[in-house]
């Protein structure tokens, strides 16, 4: 093969697989037409595939296989996508293919693998594609040996560390490190700025935190610069204007603060996204004159003023314009109406001083989506005789103070998505809505609707896929759902009676939320093939059906706060996708579900307030399984026995800190149609005695355990110190004995620690006093002795946190220790405050009035994730449904 033929770009790989049959053998192992591949190369390839489970290869990419050099017979191109399961080892036979030019191993299941340094031996590589494999750890320094490399894609892994060493990769054209856990600063001396051939750079969704070096301006060949969702701060360097070849510039979701960046020289710019920063000032008039600009996103900044649109801008190419959540004046509307090629427009939360008239958009004949949420809308413009572009497919009018159903929707025959939640509409939903021929997604939550007009048949036979009616005034029996329904949510209404069996006839149903109603009777045994099931806070009875895990698609099950009995279904062992399981506050009587350790993705297990009994240690007294578990909440049951010292050693996910995990969120999304779909992000309301912490989104780096209110005994396992991601530990009200493990001082992220009402002895480890985030500690009613550590976080606690230990002394207790050396004046001040402190303690059971709980809740909601705080005495998990990502994944 000639040298020119070997210089393949990524797309060329597909072409070669299509036209060069004489050089291909595929992974179904029908070795036809393999004359060019030498026998020893075929044997080596077979040896490589034997290192993995290749059962997925039969249904994988049809272009999978290898391609050999016609002159040497050596493997030159290897593509195995969505095919391999296992571990890519450092001594893999892959690294013996020294003639390889292109390797594509994207979307395999290589979890728990570090990125092998052996790749550095493949010095002829020109393209290396390793995205979506779950690789851990740092990029080996041996990668700098790949001096021929032109394309490197390591995106969608779990790689950590600072920016990898790429010095020597001077031929690199494409570098994609997005969706990893890289952190640290980008300094001007970084090897990144030696890559002068670079055309595509994507560092999005990492944890870099620094200013943007001016040396970005030296990468003159850059065409795509994507730095979204990091911690970049400060000003955008003026040298960015040197990148005159840029077609895409994404700086969104950072902490950048400056006036509008200098982009007027970027005459090739096609997409510009500066959303979710702190840019201020006005939009320069020159921006809208850029000849190729089609996508402009400036959401959630501090931009103000108006937008100047010259007469020539009526022929602007601008198709996407997102200006929501800024401080623009009302005059912005008229100039925008001149941008006649607009297809997607977001003007939400403009805070205009007058109602918006929808007629202003009548000139936008191509408009497909319009978001005016958070603005006052002229009631006259919502009537059926008003005008709005008939091309509209998506209309969002949340928080618009609308009190009557908009009849203008009757005219929108192209409408696919409608969200008019969080308004003041009441009465019944009009029958004509379900007659819109293309309607797929309807969100009417947080209004005052009481029912449906007309025949139920119209709704049943509609085209609706997603229907969300949360927080209204519906009551009575659940309506018959559309035959095509995929996601349905009616949380926080007053529905009664049993869940109808007709729901089982909706074969496409994937997500259902019936929480916070008054449903009675059993969970229908016919429910199956669902992904998200939220039934919490009803009056459901009977056992949890075995069929819920048919098809292994179940990802989240929350049946908390019902009257369920029986045992956990053993069929759950087949729920390979299950991440969240919550059965809090039921009457389930069972032993600890050790068998759930077979679930590879389980992150949250909450069994609180049931009738579970017996040991929670495996029969062999070894470590507990659950490598991905982060929230483990089993309080107020009847668990007994002791825990071995190595109990926690397999909890790999809880051992990784935020810096290692990058602070990613627990997110799930599914796209249903062109502009979006449904999804959810898991929100966390973590409240322990003395600590209240709210997160609208639950970071995957958080971990919490609660064993309180059981009959556990023996020593606290020393291995608890391995769980560096722990922010909350509650083992109170048990019979633990022995010393507090010294290893707990390693829990540097710990914010709440409750070990009260046990039989612990010895001293409080001094290391606990140096945990900087520890906002609450309670070791009362044990048998502890000695001086209380005098770290800042300890001495600030209430004295009730240490009472009931006859041998304890030192602040904040009034019993002083001999030789503490505390200043007499300090002791006097403490005595002066005693009476006041005692009165305060009578009024508050927890520090600063913060209650004990980890809140769990659920709600299907298409649109933005809205954090909902549900306070109770013990930990719960708050799961929210979000959806419609109109731009791209966050």
Curated annotation (Swiss-Prot):
In terms of superkingdom, the source organism counts as Eukaryota
**Cellular location(s):** Cell membrane
One short Pfam family name for this protein?
LRR_1
KW Glycoprotein (keyword) present? yes
Annotated LRR repeats reside at 97-121, 123-145, 146-171, 173-195, 196-218, 220-243, 244-268, 270-290, 291-316, 318-339, 340-363, 364-389, 391-411, 412-436, 438-461, 462-485, 487-506, 507-527, 528-551, 553-575, 577-598, 599-623, 626-650, 699-724, 726-747, 748-771, 773-796
The Gene Ontology terms for molecular function here are: protein kinase binding
**Keywords for the protein's UniProt record, in alphabetical order:** Cell membrane, Glycoprotein, Leucine-rich repeat, Membrane, Plant defense, Receptor, Repeat, Signal, Transmembrane, Transmembrane helix
Summarize the record's induction comment: By mannitol.
Signal peptide start and end residues? 1-22
Segments on the Extracellular side according to the record's topology features = 23-850
- Which segments cross the bilayer? 851-871
Q: What does this protein do?
A: Involved in the perception of necrosis and ethylene-inducing peptide 1-like proteins (NLPs), that act as extracellular signals mediating immune activation. Component of the RLP23-SOBIR1-BAK1 complex that mediates NLP-triggered immunity.
The record's similarity note reads: Belongs to the RLP family.
Q: What is this protein called?
A: Receptor like protein 23
Q: Which organism is it from?
A: Arabidopsis thaliana (Mouse-ear cress)
């Amino acid at each position: 093969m000639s040298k020119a033929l070997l210089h393949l770009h990524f797309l060329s790989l597909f072409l070669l697989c299509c036209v060069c049959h004489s050089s291909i053998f595929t992974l179904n192992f029908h070795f036809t037409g393999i004359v060019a591949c030498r026998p020893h190369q075929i044997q080596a390839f077979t040896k490589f595939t034997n290192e993995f489970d290749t059962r997925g290869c039969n249904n994988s990419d049809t272009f999978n296989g290898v391609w050999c050099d016609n002159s040497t017979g050596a493997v030159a191109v290897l593509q195995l996508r969505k095919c391999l399961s296992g571990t890519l080892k450092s001594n893999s036979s892959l690294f013996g293919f020294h003639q390889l030019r292109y390797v594509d191993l994207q979307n395999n299941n290589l979890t728990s693998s570090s990125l092998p340094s052996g790749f550095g031996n493949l010095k002829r590589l020109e393209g290396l594609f390793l995205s979506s494999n779950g690789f851990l750890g740092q990029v080996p320094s041996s990668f700098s040996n790949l001096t021929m490399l032109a394309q490197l894609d390591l995106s969608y892994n779990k790689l950590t560390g600072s920016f990898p060493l790429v010095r020597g990769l001077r031929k690199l054209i494409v570098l994609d490190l997005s969706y990893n856990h890289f952190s640290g600063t980008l300094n001007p001396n970084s090897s990144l700025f030696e890559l002068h051939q670079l055309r595509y750079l994507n560092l999005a969704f990492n944890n870099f935190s620094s200013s943007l070096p001016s040396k970005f301006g030296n990468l003159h060949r850059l065409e795509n610069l994507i730095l979204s969702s990091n911690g970049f701060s400060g000003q955008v360097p003026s040298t960015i204007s040197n990148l005159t070849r840029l077609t895409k510039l994404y700086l969104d979701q950072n902490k950048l603060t400056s006036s509008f960046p200098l982009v007027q020289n970027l005459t090739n710019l096609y997409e510009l996204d500066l959303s979710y920063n702190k840019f201020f000032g006005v939009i320069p008039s020159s921006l809208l004159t850029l000849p190729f600009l089609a996508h402009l996103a400036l959401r959630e900044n501090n931009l103000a003023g108006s937008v100047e649109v010259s007469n020539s801008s009526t022929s602007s190419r601008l198709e996407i314009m997102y200006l929501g959540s800024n401080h623009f004046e009302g005059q912005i509307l008229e100039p925008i109406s001149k941008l006649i090629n607009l297809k997607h427009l977001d003007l939400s939360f403009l805070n205009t001083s007058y109602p918006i008239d929808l007629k202003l958009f009548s000139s936008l004949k191509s408009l497909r989506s319009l978001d005016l949420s958070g603005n006052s809308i002229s009631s006259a413009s919502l009537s059926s005789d008003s005008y709005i572009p008939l091309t509209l497919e998506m209309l969002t009018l949340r928080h618009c103070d609308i009190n009557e159903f908009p009849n203008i929707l009757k005219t929108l025959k192209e409408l696919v998505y409608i969200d008019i939640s969080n308004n003041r509409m009441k009465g019944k939903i009009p029958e004509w809505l379900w007659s819109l021929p293309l309607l797929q997604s309807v969100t009417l939550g947080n209004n005052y609707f009481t029912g449906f007009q007309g025949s139920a048949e119209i709704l049943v036979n509609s085209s609706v896929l997603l229907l969300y009616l949360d927080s209204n005034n519906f009551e009575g029996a659940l309506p018959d759902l559309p035959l095509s329904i995929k996601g349905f949510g009616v949380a926080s209404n007053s529905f009664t009676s049993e869940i109808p069996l007709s729901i089982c006839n909706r074969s496409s149903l994937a997500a259902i939320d019936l929480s916070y109603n008054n449903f009675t009777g059993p969970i229908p045994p016919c429910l199956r093939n669902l992904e998200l099931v939220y039934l919490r806070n009803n009056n459901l009875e009977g056992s949890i059906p075995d069929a819920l895990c048919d098809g292994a698609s179940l990802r989240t099950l929350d049946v908390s706060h019902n009257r369920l009995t029986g045992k956990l279904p053993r069929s759950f062992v087949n729920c390979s996708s299950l991440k969240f399981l919550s059965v809090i506050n039921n009457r389930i009587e069972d032993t600890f579900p050790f068998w759930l350790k077979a679930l590879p993705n389980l992150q949250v297990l909450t069994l609180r307030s049931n009738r579970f009994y017996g040991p929670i240690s495996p029969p062999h007294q070894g470590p507990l399984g659950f490598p991905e578990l982060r929230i483990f909440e089993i309080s107020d049951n009847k668990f007994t026995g002791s825990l071995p010292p190595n109990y926690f050693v397999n909890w790999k996910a809880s051992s990784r800190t935020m810096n290692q995990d990058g602070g990613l969120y627990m997110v799930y999304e599914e796209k249903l149609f062109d502009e979006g779909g449904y999804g959810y992000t898991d929100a966390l309301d973590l409240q322990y005695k003395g600590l209240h912490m709210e997160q609208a989104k639950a970071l995957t780096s958080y971990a919490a355990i609660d064993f309180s209110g059981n009959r556990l005994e023996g020593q606290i396992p020393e291995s608890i110190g391995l769980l560096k991601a722990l922010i909350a530990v509650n083992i109170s009200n048990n019979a633990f004995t022995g010393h507090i493990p010294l290893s707990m001082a390693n829990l540097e992220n710990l914010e709440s620690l409750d070990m009260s009402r046990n039989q612990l002895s010895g001293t409080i480890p001094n290391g606990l006093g140096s945990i900087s985030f520890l906002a609450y500690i309670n070791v009362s009613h044990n048998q502890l002795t000695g001086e209380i550590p005098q770290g800042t976080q300890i001495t600030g606690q209430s004295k009730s946190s240490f009472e009931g230990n006859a041998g304890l002394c030192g602040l904040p207790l009034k019993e002083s220790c001999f030789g503490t050396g505390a200043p007499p004046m300090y002791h006097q001040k403490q005595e002066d405050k005693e009476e006041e402190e005692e009165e305060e303690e009578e009024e508050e059971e927890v520090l600063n009035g913060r209650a004990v709980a980890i809140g769990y809740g659920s709600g299907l909601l298409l649109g933005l994730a809205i954090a909902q705080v549900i306070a109770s005495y013990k930990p719960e998990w708050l799961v929210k449904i979000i959806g419609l990502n109109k731009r791209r994944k966050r």
